[in-house]
Structures are given as structure tokens and as C-alpha cells.
A protein has these predicted regions:
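Juxtacatalytic substrate-recognition/specificity segment
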Residues: 28-163, 169
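Beta/coil-rich, acidic/histidine-enriched accessory regions frequently appended to metallopeptidases
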Residues: 28-31, 36-39, 222-225, 250-252, ...
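Acidic/His/Gly-enriched intrinsically disordered linker/tail segments
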Residues: 31-33, 105, 120-131, 139, ...
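A flexible loop/linker signature enriched in serine peptidases of the S9 family
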Residues: 190, 336-339, 354-364, 378-384, ...
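Outer-membrane beta-barrel initiation region
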Residues: 333, 342, 589-590, 595-705, ...
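Feature captures outer-membrane beta-barrel proteins of Gram-negative bacteria and organelles
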Residues: 414, 546, 662-669, 689-708, ...
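Transmembrane beta-strands of outer-membrane beta-barrel pores
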Residues: 652-656, 669, 680-686, 697-701, ...
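C-terminal outer-membrane beta-barrel translocator/porin domains of Gram-negative envelope proteins
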Residues: 709-713, 719-720, 765-893
């Protein structure tokens, strides 16, 4: 639904806010306006950070400098003539991630929240070093070029056309970044079990994708991880077989050509495709190399893995001379795979678990063990911990969601299995992994995150308040309270060390670190008051392990017939040996049942296991406040330096009678508090210069945007001949977030505008000029969701209700009222098919009336209203399909 101006009458368009629904992220700030940003720098980097995080900033700056030297040697290149790389430290999201871009300047963002131990990046000892190695590789490769592109960048700045490497397929770019992170970090993804297990299981099942199936974005397991998994394994395979010097040579080939075409036979373009570029380096096409890669994995996975190869003492409850098969020891109860986490038994012979399916919205599911039927209990994303209270028949879980429209923090929720209702217990508390105290129904043990430290905490259900009871550590996850309430087991990570299992007293004192010096250990579960189970990273595998606190004996359930375990739960009862676990297989994580007494295990004595039996003194792993390092004095962030334009690019606008070439530039500071975009054009027929300027300020609660435009079109009328139509507009716009969470979003919109519209006829004397000054108000709601394999929105709704009024007392020539309503709904059929419904209603009244049109109008900048994604649904009908002062539209696609 858009409005349309007519050359035959003094009527101008009314904005119907479609862009707000297409680009809802533009209506709220990314970082809270109250954050005071500081910076430190050296010759190569500028680290920008919130006040109070200087120690992290100093460590980041030093680590980045070390990695830069190492990575430029690895890739055999130097970043010529580039300004300093900006690194922004973000502690506003309880998620582990990073990003990098060269546009409009080289910048990296690091989420300071460390990954949990079950993450594919959770095996590293140093999260900041790992993410910096990955993102710096992107920056170095993005900036690779040739003499021609380096010269052109001096003139046009960071114009994307002058950065050929960004056009390399994403799976190759991400594969190179994972390869580099693994070359510079012990915990890189190629050095830890997760990727190896996924690849081996997929290869063993004969599900490695063919070249044609892999190209692009595959929808089979592991979904969005595929470009990292296969890309990294492929690049690593090439480095091992053909030499690690071939990988940087490949980047140079991609960077040499300024555009992805070469010109042969005159000016006829011939694409230098991916196959040809690989062939120049490896003398084989990508398809041939991929077949070699597949054959390598088929050969490697022919034999079944044997994880127990160290000659330890083995015990099997059945017949050790005739070990059971996998099918005899594990009863799979799901088969579709994907991500299944935190399975727990409930008292009604059912299992509750979290299903994170990249094809649909995640949530908590329930599985009936007898019938094997599943049903979704609730929709919820960002779940990071789950606990079942058998006394209450309730699920307590933690999940990250938006808080105050800006932060994405983890909070505690309660799901009543009797009523299937969810209650949010905290807001913005940064609490994780809730576990009920067996002796106090109002007490919940959990982990609390404060700045860059993790603490054991107690949440009181009566007062809805939490209290820190332990020292701070680099990270803490997955806690469990012993049945006798004398110990709290936790997955613990100290600074630059591996994940371990530690015991705390109920008052938060660290009593013992059980697995110091072992591989990664996490996810403790109590069998009884003295036997503690957990997951152990052992021989490139994840297996069950246990510690008997009475004897200090360390058991490893390294049965070669058991797949790698990701999460598990024990059925309540001293004599009950049932266990449900989430296993790695070729489809992802599937749930299976096991009996502990049937599992083969081996015993290691305390000394052999490296157990730390002595009582540890309480200590803080969180960096203490210290004086800034010499030469690293912090100062306020210089946003003006980054706001200055860093590029110019060609642009155009047109109508049916005139094409106007022009230029565009834009800029933003690192915190996105200030941003602008400037476009200018010149028309040879109208002999006019157009300007379109927008500045946005995100330093207050409402996002404020100032817009000025002076645009001219050369038109023709059958009655009056050629004429020049001019629209001059000043707008002050405000966006007010009402409801922001991961499931849906709602905003208020306000607009004050002063607008002048005129037509100057070339064959007649005089001109028509009209003033339209007033306000616009709107409210918008959007719950439409895209998923990994979506080519359009797949479910949810979006709606908008808007009203506009022009006032004479503001200088308008007429009092005009206009209103519009738009509703869209998306219904998933058999995927990826979607049924979309669209209803639009509009009307205008007063001393004059607005003119609306309904249809997929093409804008004067060459893009359709629905955006440049041709697969977006609800494109509507062709331009000008229906025109009028009011009406409705309904269609189904």
C-alpha cells in the first residue's frame, strides 16, 4: 500500500511506512544510549569499549596486535594504506559471537560473553583470542587487492566494487577464517572434537553433500553451520594435501581481479568462475577437488572408531568378551536430528527437552516414551538451561531475550506442565542455569553474569531478588545440587584454562576442583549424594564420566559402541539406572535411552586422573581493576572521526522520461549513535540537481531522524505537454519501541513534515505550487519470522495502522486527513512452501483528498517496494494497478 502523486492535480504522496516493516531493525538502537564509550589505541588498532571494561580492552588490544603479526605472515600480505582497525567490545548480549566488515571502515565487533562448554567454540581456553583470530582473518582477506584496486581505493575509498574478495562464496570465506583460527589457537574448531564428530558421522552415513548439493546454503544438517564445517574441512584438506602455501595464493587469485569478470573477444564479458580460479592454483577445478575431499573422508571413516586405546582397566557389566552392539546399548527415540538439548525425565514417563530447529521456531518439547509422539509445549528461543522440579511438576529454564529494547540478557522462567503456562520470574537479571534447592522451595541456585565475571547466585522466589554467594570466575555453567544438599557441582572455567567440574558449598565457597588437568569436563548430574556424572572430552570424543566422592575413583564410560554424548539426564531413584542422552549422529543430536549397568567403563585412580583433592582457596578469576598499561591511556570515543565519509559510489534515480546519474555516500560511528546518508543527482533534461539527506541520532530513548530532500522529475502530460515536478520536503521522525523481544516487535512512529510541491510547465507560463504541512502517526507490529532455509517469511504476522493530518494553521493549503491499515499473515505449509495473506485498506477525507495506489510499484531508485529480494512474498500487482482516494486490496499468494 503506497500513495501516488498525480501530475494532473496538486496532490502529493503519503508515506505508509512499508520500509519499517521490511527493515524493522532500523527503528531501535543497537546499543543502549546510556553507555559511555571509551577508546584506547596503538599504531594498528582502536579498541572501543564501555566505561569500566578497560582491562578487557587492554588485553584485546595486545592480543589483536600479536595476532595481526601472526596472521599477516600466514596469509602473506600486508594491509596497504589502511586506517586503523576498530574493535568494539560488546557486553550487551548474552551470546558468543563476533563480526567483521571493511565497510565503511575496517571494524570488528566482539561479544564478550564467553561460549558455554557445549558450544562448537566452547573448547577454547581464550575466547577473545579465538574470535579475534577469526574476524581478523576476514579483515585481512577482505582488504586483499591488486595495484589497480589499491590505487582506486585512494580515490573512491571503501567502495565495495573495489574489494573483490567479498564476492567469494561465503563458505570459502568462513572456511578460511576457521582454518586460520585453528592455526593460531589450540581451541580452534579444527582442533576440537565437535567438527570432527559431525564430519565423521555424516561421512560414515554416506551423507556428505555432493558439489551441486552443497553450493549455496544447504538445508540438511547442520544447517547454518554447514558453511563453517565444510568450508573449514575443505580448506584444511587442501592445505594438507597441496601445501599450506596454496591457501594464501588462492586469496591472491581472488583479489587480483577487480570485478568477477574478465573481458575476452572484445568487450564481451566472460565470467572467471570459481572453478577457474581454483584451477589456477591447484590445477584442478573445484568440483574435482571436492570429489577428492569426499573420497578422503570416505576412506577415513571406513573403520569404526575405537575410543579406548590407552590400555586402561575395562569393566563391562555383561559379557566383556562379546560386547553389545550400539543398537543393544542405545535405544534411539528420535530420528529427525537437528539440535536437541537438556533432556530430562518427568514423573509421567515422558521426556522434556529443548528443540532448536533451524527450520522452524525453537521451543520446549515433550516426548512420550511409550508412544514416541512429541508435542511442542511452548515457543521460545535463546534457551540456555533447563531443570525439572518433580515436586511441583514444573520446568525452570533460563533464556536470553531483549531487555529495555537494547540488551539481550538471560532471565529465569517457569513453565507449569499442568497448565502449560509460562511465567517470567526476572527481567534483565543475567541469570542462567536455574536449579531448585531440594530443602527450600523458594530458593533457586543459578549462575549470574556481572560485567565479565560469572558468579554462583541464589534467587529468592518470594522477594524476586538474587544474591551472589561465590567468587567470580571467567565463566560458569550447568550447576547441579546434590540430593543431600551438601554440595553444588558446577562446570567451571578459569581464565585461559579448560572447563572443569568443581564443587561448591551451599554458601558458595569453592571446596574442590575435581577434574583439573583433564580434557574439557562439563554438565554435572548427580546419581546420588556421592556419585557425580558429567561429560568428558576424551580422545576426540565426548563420553560419560563419573567421580565417586567417597573413594575418589574416576570412571570413564568410554564404550566404543556409544555415540558421542552432548547432554544427558538420569532417572530419579537410587536403584534406577535409566539414562536419556542427546547423541551426535549424521542428522544432528538425537535422543536415546541407555541403562548404566550395560555400559562398558574403565577406572582410573585419583592420581592417574589428575584429580585435585586438596581444598582450593577461594579466588577471583575476574580481572581486578588496575591502572592502565603504559601508553594505553583511555579517552572518550571520537565518534566524529568515524562519522566522516569513507567512500563515494555511483548511484541513480529515474522515471520514464529521465535518468539522473548521481553519487552516494554514508557513514556511521562504531556505536551507531550517529549515522547519515547523502545522495545527489543531476538531470540533463530538467537541468536540476537533486539532494536527499538523512541523519539519524540514537543517543536518546526515541530514535530521531532528520530528513531533507529536494527532488525533481521531468514528466509529460498529454494535456499540458512537458513539465517539471518538484517536491521539497523537511521531516523530523521519531521511532519509539513499545515491545521488543525475539518473538515479535512493536513500535510507535511520529513524523512532523513541511512539504512543498510544484509543477512548472515548459509550454505554459506560470506554475502550480502547493504546501502540505502536518503530522503523521503510526503503530507497527511484526512477528513474521525467517528461518535458515526460508526464501520468504515463513510464519507470523505483520500489521500497520497509520494516520496523517495536514493543518492550515501549520501553513498547509488544505486540511486533509488520511488513514491506512495493512495486514499480512504467513502460514507454513509443507516446507519451504508458504501461504501468504494480504489485506490493505486506505481512505482520505477533508478539504482535499489524497491519491493512493495499490501494487508493486517500482521506485525511482530502481528497486521494487518489496526490496531487491525477488522471492519476498506480497509483491502485489504491477505499478498503478489500482488508483483512487480510498479502497481496499486483498490477495493470496
Amino acid at each position: 500500500l503506497l500513495e501516488r502523486s498525480s501530475p494532473h492535480s496538486p496532490i502529493v504522496p503519503l508515506l505508509l511506512f512499508v520500509l519499517l516493516l521490511v527493515f524493522p531493525g532500523a527503528t531501535f538502537t543497537k546499543y543502549h544510549p546510556e553507555i559511555k564509550w571509551k577508546e584506547i589505541s596503538n599504531r594498528r588498532f582502536i579498541v572501543v569499549f564501555p566505561m569500566g571494561y578497560q582491562d578487557k580492552a587492554v588485553y584485546t588490544l595486545n592480543t589483536a596486535q600479536q595476532l595481526y603479526i601472526r596472521l599477516t605472515q600466514l596469509w602473506g600480505t600486508q594491509m596497504k594504506g589502511q586506517s586503523k582497525i576498530r574493535i568494539l567490545l560488546n557486553d550487551g548480549y548474552d551470546d558468543s559471537n563476533g563480526s567483521a566488515t571493511f565497510f565503511p571502515y575496517n571494524q570488528i565487533e566482539v561479544y564478550l560473553f564467553p561460549p558455554p562448554p557445549d558450544s562448537t567454540v566452547g573448547s577454547g581456553k581464550d575466547w577473545i583470542r579465538l574470535v579475534l583470530a577469526h574476524e581478523l582473518t576476514h579483515i585481512i582477506n577482505f582488504n586483499a587487492g591488486s595495484g589497480f584496486t589499491y590505487f582506486m581505493r585512494k580515490i573512491f575509498g571503501t567502495n565495495p566494487l573495489l574489494y573483490p574478495v567479498i564476492y567469494v562464496p561465503e563458505w570459502i570465506l568462513e572456511g578460511m577464517a576457521v582454518y586460520a583460527e585453528s592455526q593460531t589457537n589450540e581451541g580452534g574448531r579444527l582442533n576440537t572434537p565437535d567438527y570432527r564428530l559431525m564430519l565423521n558421522e555424516i561421512a560414515r552415513a554416506g551423507k556428505m553433500p555432493a558439489w551441486g548439493d552443497f553450493w549455496g546454503d544447504p538445508t540438511s544438517w547442520p544447517g547454518g553451520t554447514s558453511k563453517y564445517l565444510y568450508g573449514a574441512a575443505f580448506i584444511n584438506f587442501l592445505a594438507e594435501k597441496y601445501g599450506d602455501d596454496k591457501i594464501p595464493e588462492l586469496v591472491k587469485i581472488f583479489a587480483y581481479y577487480p570485478i568477477p569478470y574478465t573481458f575476452t573477444q572484445g568487450l564481451e564479458p566472460k565470467k572467471l568462475n570459481i572453478h577457474q580460479r581454483f584451477k589456477r592454483v591447484f590445477e584442478k577445478s573445484t568440483r574435482e577437488l571436492w570429489e577428492e575431499f569426499l573420497q578422503y573422508f570416505k576412506t577415513r571413516t571406513k573403520e569404526k572408531p575405537n575410543h579406548s586405546n590407552d590400555g586402561a582397566n575395562h569393566i563391562c557389566a555383561d559379557n566383556p568378551n562379546n560386547p553389545d552392539s550400539t543398537e543393544d546399548k542405545v535405544t534411539l527415540i528420535t530420528h529427525e536430528g537437528r539440535y536437541k538439548k537438556y533432556p530430562v525425565f518427568t514423573k509421567d514417563e515422558k521426556i522434556v527437552y529443548v528443540n532448536h530447529n533451524y527450520k522452524e521456531y525453537p521451543g520446549i518439547y515433550q516426548l512420550d516414551i511409550k508412544t514416541r509422539k512429541t508435542r511442542r509445549l511452548i515457543k521460545k528461543s535463546g534457551i540456555n538451561g533447563l531443570y525439572y522440579s518433580s515436586q511441583e511438576n514444573k520446568i525452570y529454564f533460563s533464556a536470553a531475550d531483549y531487555f529495555k529494547s537494547f540488551y539481550q540478557f538471560s532471565d529465569i522462567y517457569c513453565l507449569d506442565l499442568e497448565t502449560n503456562k509460562v511465567k517470567r520470574l526476572t527481567r534483565g537479571a543475567r541469570l542462567f542455569y536455574p536449579v531448585k534447592d531440594p530443602s527450600d522451595r523458594n530458593k533457586i541456585y543459578c549462575v549470574k553474569r556481572v560485567n565479565t565475571g560469572s558468579y554462583l547466585s541464589v534467587f529468592d522466589l518470594k522477594t524476586r531478588s538474587d544474591k551472589i554467594i561465590s567468587a567470580g570466575f571467567d565463566s560458569m555453567a550447568y550447576i547441579a545440587v546434590s540430593p543431600d544438599n551438601r554440595c553444588i557441582a558446577a562446570s567451571l572455567k578459569r581464565k585461559n584454562q579448560q572447563w572443569t567440574i568443581a564443587l561448591f558449598s551451599p554458601d558458595g565457597q569453592l571446596k574442590k576442583v575435581l577434574t583439573g588437568g583433564q580434557g574439557k569436563c562439563y554438565y554435572p548430574v548427580w546419581k546420588n549424594a556421592h556419585l557425580l556424572f558429567f561429560i568428558y572430552q576424551y580422545n576426540n570424543h565426548y563420553c560419560l564420566a563419573a567421580v565417586d566422592l567417597k573413594t575418589d575413583i574416576f570412571y570413564i564410560y568410554d564404550d566404543p559402541h556409544i555415540p558421542a554424548v552432548n547432554f544427558f539426564s538420569l532417572k530419579a531413584g537410587e536403584r534406577n539406572h535409566k539414562l536419556v542422552a542427546s547423541f551426535f549422529d549424521s542428522n544432528g543430536y538425537n535422543l536415546g535411552l541407555m541403562d548404566l549397568v550395560r555400559l562398558e567403563k574403565k577406572i582410573k585412580e585419583k592420581a592417574a586422573a589428575g584429580m585435585s583433592g586438596e581444598k582450593k582457596q577461594e579466588s577471583r578469576d575476574v580481572e581486578k581493576k588496575s591502572n592502565p598499561a603504559p601508553g594505553y591511556r583511555s579517552k572518550s570515543y571520537n565518534s566524529l572521526r568515524d562519522l566522516i565519509p569513507k567512500y563515494i559510489s555511483g548511484y541513480f534515480r529515474y522515471n520514464s522520461n529521465e535518468l539522473k546519474p548521481g553519487i552516494i555516500t554514508s557513514g556511521h560511528d562504531l556505536s551507531y549513535r550517529n549515522s547519515f546518508i547523502l545522495k545527489t543527482y543531476y538531470g540533463s533534461r530538467s537541468k536540476t540537481t537533486d539532494i536527499d539527506f538523512t541523519y539519524t541520532y540514537d543517543g536518546w530513548y526515541p530514535t530521531l531522524s532528520f530528513h531533507y530532500s529536494d527532488l525533481t522529475d521531468y514528466n509529460h502530460s498529454s494535456d499540458y505537454g512537458d513539465f517539471i515536478h518538484n517536491e521539497k520536503k523537511f521531516e523530523l521522525v521519531g521511532y519509539y519501541p513499545l515491545r521488543i523481544n525475539t518473538r515479535d516487535r512493536a513500535y510507535l512512529y511520529s513524523n512532523f513534515h513541511i512539504e512543498t510541491v510544484g509543477d512548472r510547465y515548459l509550454n505554459l507560463s506560470g506554475q502550480n505550487r502547493l504546501k502540505l504541512n502536518g503530522i503523521k502517526l503510526g503503530i507497527f507490529y511484526n512477528s513474521a519470522q525467517r528461518y535458515y532455509d526460508s526464501i520468504s517469511y515463513a510464519d507470523g504476522i505483520s500489521l500497520s495502522l497509520s494516520y496523517s493530518r495536514e493543518f492550515k494553521w501549520l501553513g498547509s493549503d488544505y486540511n486533509i486527513n488520511s488513514a491506512a491499515f495493512q495486514y499480512k499473515q504467513y502460514v507454513s505449509l509443507f516446507r519451504p512452501n508458504v501461504l501468504a495473506l494480504h489485506l490493505g485498506i486506505t481512505d482520505s477525507w477533508g478539504e482535499a483528498r489524497r491519491l493512493f495506489y495499490m501494487g508493486g510499484a517500482q521506485s525511482k531508485e530502481g528497486f521494487y517496494v518489496a526490496g531487491d529480494n525477488l522471492f519476498d512474498l506480497m509483491r502485489g500487482y504491477p505499478s498503478g494497478y489500482r488508483v483512487g482516494t480510498g479502497g481496499y486490496l486483498f490477495n493470496i499468494e
